[in-house]
């Protein structure tokens, strides 16, 4: 049976995720179908797939999560080739040999390359050997401080994607070569590729030529073994268990190895796997931000977002709504807003209130880019293509990596915008003019003059954000005409993927920094609640003792002051006075005195009598408060530090608790103060390392594990 006779039907199956083909000649319906369902469900599927122990390659169903898993090589994942693909691969390889023997003139088989394709030769094998030699044009910078080697994760991703492309049987290469690359992957032998030197059209020629160089035993080829040791080609073959000698490339095989987009699309796959998770993390962190900032949850109401129509926005709002629904912080904030509606603005600032509108389009961009790259890694992207069924070689341009360049430019812009929102939220969080009662810089010490909290961290965040915004600039607009004006437009796909990888790395610095600050804010809210409760109890106790009765035991008019005194404690920001609660220059004592003075003025007739004068009681009240309150506040602090707080931490009753628990308990971080040695950078580093190891994924998804994929019903 002709292996390519049903090519059109196969394309339909591929585009429709393996489902039965339908009338969709332009593939738009399949592209739209792939975007059905929630982004969160898709991320969950990606994580699940990432953790599977085996990747079965057949050319049509490779996913970015599988590429990321093979690239990372931290899950013990192995690659297995589909035997069903062997016949198709062999058919195209045989066709090339037959066509050459029959005198057929084919690009890259009997002709020169690119702008010099007018040249002709009958030495097909020698031509492939020369192709690999002249494309080995990269610089590694060995022996210098400059590292010009492509990260091994990107190389492994490229190897996997290239195998997948060649398995489809349109490229004219032997199956044995694909098996050899698979053995290199499964034995963790990674060829050394140059970091720079490709314009991803005609494919990633220069870096891919170094994989071909290793397979053919070029003396300049190098690989890295499982333990980081440097291997030459012979040692690499032995370590991978490749029994044969080096490959003598047949006609077209060199071109099949180098003329494609897998380095750009492979790295793009790794980048997008992380970008999707970071997008979900940004949604959850925005909800936690609303909690610790005493935000008004009205900004997540479904009607607002339904009227805007954008699915990314609707989902982002629904996820935040789910986390805030039933949150103990939201309930407490509602009571505070009822006590004094004028204490804070009617509406929260944009970084909080419009976070769904901001993040929604970014999620859409990342999701669409993911699907675009997923199509690319399942594409046949070299030239010429061998159509065995029609007995011809098709000369086209599938090596043009524009889907990669455009998707990566767009993703990088989205990543930069996520970082911008994080920085805006972080800036509000550490600023006591905006953070609704938290201390400046989130300082937690007894003496704020010797604790500057997250000040250095805010400077670092500004640095991260600035670099990230610079990286948001497009790469694809900087195309240069190459190769004697034959490659006069080119995608710059790998360059864009590299820059997007840099952007993701920076966002991975910002995210743990921000989450550490949010955990600090959570702890400060807990401390604040306990300190305020102590102040309130102490003021009540002193008021009862000094203001209730007169010198002869009779009820005194000042007994009516207690309720208003406690209102002051409720309204006043605790950290505005708690380092010296009885200071006459701090707002607590000033406003408590003001209450007593106002009651005295309202009690004008009784003020003439020393026995009923409220004014005469002020000194006694203040002196006793000064004696008692500092001791009680210190006692409350000590109890908090010993884990014996009178009031438990509200976070334990919230859906955001799994992230807090992960940061504090699993990673062993703590509330930072100037009284301790540990620095903010140490804590951020712990979380950054854990994020790079993928450890944040499970607690993140646990926060929204109960979400049913829909907004709360309108009522």
Swiss-Prot record:
Active site (UniProt): 107 (proton donor/acceptor)
Q: What happens to this protein after translation, modification-wise?
A: Contains an active site 4-methylidene-imidazol-5-one (MIO), which is formed autocatalytically by cyclization and dehydration of residues Ala-Ser-Gly.
Known NCBIfam families for this protein? phe_am_lyase
What gene does the UniProt entry assign to this protein? PAL17.1
- Localisation: Cytoplasm
Q: What is this protein called?
A: Phenylalanine ammonia-lyase
Its recorded reaction(s) are: L-phenylalanine = (E)-cinnamate + NH4(+)
Species source reads Stylosanthes humilis
Q: In which pathway does it act?
A: Phenylpropanoid metabolism; trans-cinnamate biosynthesis; trans-cinnamate from L-phenylalanine: step 1/1
């Amino acid at each position: 049976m002709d292996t390519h006779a049903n090519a059109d039907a196969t394309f339909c199956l591929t585009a429709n995720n393996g489902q039965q083909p339908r009338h969709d000649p332009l593939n738009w319906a399949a592209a739209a179908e792939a975007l059905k369902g929630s982004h969160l469900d898709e991320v969950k599927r990606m994580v699940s797939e990432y953790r599977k122990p085996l990747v079965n390659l057949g050319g049509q169903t490779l996913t970015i999560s599988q590429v990321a898993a093979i690239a990372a090589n931290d899950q013990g994942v192995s690659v297995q080739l589909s035997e069903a693909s062997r016949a198709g691969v062999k058919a195209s390889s045989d066709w090339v040999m037959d066509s050459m023997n029959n005198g057929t003139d084919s690009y890259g088989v009997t002709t020169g390359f690119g702008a010099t394709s007018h040249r002709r030769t009958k030495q097909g094998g020698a031509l492939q050997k020369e192709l690999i030699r002249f494309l080995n044009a990269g610089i590694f910078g060995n022996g210098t401080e400059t590292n010009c080697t492509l990260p091994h994760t990107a190389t492994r991703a490229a190897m996997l994607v290239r195998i997948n492309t060649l398995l489809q049987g349109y490229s004219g290469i032997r199956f044995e070569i694909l098996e050899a690359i698979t053995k290199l992957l499964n034995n963790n032998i990674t060829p050394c590729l140059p970091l720079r030197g490709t314009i991803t059209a005609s494919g990633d020629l220069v870096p891919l030529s170094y994989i071909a160089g290793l397979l053919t035993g070029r003396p300049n080829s190098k690989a890295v073994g499982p333990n980081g040791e440097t291997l030459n080609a012979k040692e690499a073959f032995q370590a991978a268990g490749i029994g044969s000698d080096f490959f003598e490339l047949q006609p077209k095989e060199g071109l099949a190895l180098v003329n494609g987009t897998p380095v750009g699309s492979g790295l793009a796959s790794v980048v997008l796997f992380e970008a999707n998770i970071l997008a979900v993390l940004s949604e959850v962190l925005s909800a936690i931000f609303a909690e610790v900032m005493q935000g008004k949850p009205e900004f997540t109401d479904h009607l607002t977002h339904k009227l805007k129509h954008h699915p990314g926005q609707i989902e982002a709002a629904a996820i935040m709504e789910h986390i805030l629904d039933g949150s103990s912080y939201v309930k407490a904030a509602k009571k505070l807003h009822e006590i004094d509606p004028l204490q804070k603005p009617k509406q929260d600032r944009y970084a909080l209130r419009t976070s769904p509108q901001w993040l929604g389009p970014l999620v859409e961009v990342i999701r669409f880019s993911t699907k675009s790259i997923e199509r690319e890694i399942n594409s046949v992207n070299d030239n010429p293509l061998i159509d065995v069924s029609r007995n011809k070689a098709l000369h086209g341009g599938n090596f043009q990596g524009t889907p990669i360049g455009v998707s990566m430019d767009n993703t990088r812009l989205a990543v930069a915008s996520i970082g911008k929102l994080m920085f805006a939220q972080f800036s509000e969080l550490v600023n006591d003019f905006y953070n609704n009662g938290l201390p400046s810089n989130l300082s937690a010490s007894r003496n704020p003059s010797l604790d500057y909290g997250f000040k250095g961290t805010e400077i670092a965040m500004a640095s991260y954000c600035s670099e990230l915004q610079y990286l948001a600039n497009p790469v694809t607009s900087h195309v240069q005409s190459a190769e004697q004006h034959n490659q006069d437009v080119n995608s710059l796909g790998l360059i864009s993927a590299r820059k997007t990888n840099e952007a993701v790395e920076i966002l991975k610095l910002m995210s743990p920094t921000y989450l550490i600050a949010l955990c600090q804010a959570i702890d400060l809210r807990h401390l604040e609640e306990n300190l305020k409760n102590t102040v309130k109890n102490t003021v009540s106790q002193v008021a009862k003792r000094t203001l209730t009765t007169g010198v002869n035991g009779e009820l005194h008019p000042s007994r009516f002051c207690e309720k208003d005194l406690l209102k002051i404690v409720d309204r006043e920001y605790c950290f505005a006075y708690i380092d010296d609660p009885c200071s006459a220059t701090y707002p607590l004592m000033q406003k408590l005195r003001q209450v007593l003075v106002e009651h005295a003025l309202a009690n004008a007739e009784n003020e003439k009598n020393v026995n009923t004068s409220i004014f005469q009681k002020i000194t006694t009240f203040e002196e006793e408060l000064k004696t008692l309150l500092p001791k009680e506040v210190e006692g409350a602090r000590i109890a908090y530090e010993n884990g014996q707080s009178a009031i438990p931490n509200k976070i334990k009753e919230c859906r955001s608790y799994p992230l807090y628990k992960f940061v504090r308990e699993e990673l062993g971080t703590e509330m930072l103060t100037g009284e301790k040695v540990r620095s903010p950078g140490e804590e951020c580093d712990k979380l950054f390392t854990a994020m790079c190891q993928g450890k944040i994924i499970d607690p993140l998804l646990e926060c929204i594990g109960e979400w049913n994929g829909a907004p709360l019903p309108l009522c």
